[in-house]
Every structure is written in structure tokens, then in C-alpha cells.
């Protein structure tokens, strides 16, 4: 797979926060990825509430049989990036707001949430979002 920077390199992440140093983590959130016999692909939990100013370490474990990704962004950014991925399905993410998680593995993403906003996390591998791989993050005061 060829790497690409996609939307996030072109965007200013200030409105959703920013990557952060592991030593500044104030909260850890475990997220699991699973696939069901009925064909659904899910993040658990699929709704996360975070206080503004919190630096979070997401620990994402893929318990499924397929590779997945955890992509964090605004609803608009994700929609744009989803279109990009449909045109370039073999591109690997190098975005600071995304991690790829092969089957049976765990990955981490450290992010500081600096403004009140609503965000989405999603797997943008073709067909995965449609199979249920998305969730929301509500950043509150």
C-alpha cells in the first residue's frame, strides 16, 4: 500500500484538537473492534464523552479477522476523506489522526481535545463504515 496524507495534511486540526505527547495523557480509553456473524463491523464503545482539555490515549484492539483503521475527525473531514479513499483504496494512512490495526493487534493514538465539538471515529476501508464501523466523540466543557 502506498502512503498518503489525505485530508488531514491539508486541514488544520485545531478545530478537533491535536496529536499529543504520551507523557501528557490524562485519560485512557480502550476501544475494541469486532466483526459479527451477521456481517456487522463494530467499535465498542461507539459513543465517547471527553472533557475539553483532556489528553486521551486510545488503546484500540482489533479482535476481528480483518484489518481495520481508527480515523478521528470532524463529520465534514471524514466525508471528504471517505471520498478520497474510494478513489484511492490502496493508500495507507500516514495521518496523525489515524491508525491502522491489523487483525489480532492493538494500536494506540494519543490526542488532545482542546475545543468543545462533536467528532466521529470511523474505519474508512471500503464498506466498513457501511457495516457499522463508526462512533461519535462529544467533547464538552
List each language-model region with its residue ranges.
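Short beta-strand and strand-turn-strand segments in soluble, beta-rich domains
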Residues: 39-40, 86-95
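Extracellular/periplasmic metallocenter environments
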Residues: 2-13, 95-141
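Short edge beta-strand segments in beta-sheet-rich domains
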Residues: 26, 67, 130-134
Amino acid at each position: 500500500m502506498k502512503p498518503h496524507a489525505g485530508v488531514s495534511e491539508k486541514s488544520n486540526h485545531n478545530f478537533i484538537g491535536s496529536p499529543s505527547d504520551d507523557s501528557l495523557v490524562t485519560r485512557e480509553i480502550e476501544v475494541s473492534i469486532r466483526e459479527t456473524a451477521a456481517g456487522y463491523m463494530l467499535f465498542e464503545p461507539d459513543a465517547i464523552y471527553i472533557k475539553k482539555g483532556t489528553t486521551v490515549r486510545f488503546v484500540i484492539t482489533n479482535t476481528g479477522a480483518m484489518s481495520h483503521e481508527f480515523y478521528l475527525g470532524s463529520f465534514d473531514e471524514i466525508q471528504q476523506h471517505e471520498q478520497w479513499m474510494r478513489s484511492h483504496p490502496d493508500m495507507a494512512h500516514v495521518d496523525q489522526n489515524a491508525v491502522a490495526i491489523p487483525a489480532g493487534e492493538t494500536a494506540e493514538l494519543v490526542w488532545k481535545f482542546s475545543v468543545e465539538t462533536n467528532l466521529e471515529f470511523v474505519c474508512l476501508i471500503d464498506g466498513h463504515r457501511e457495516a457499522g464501523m463508526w462512533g461519535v466523540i462529544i467533547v464538552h466543557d
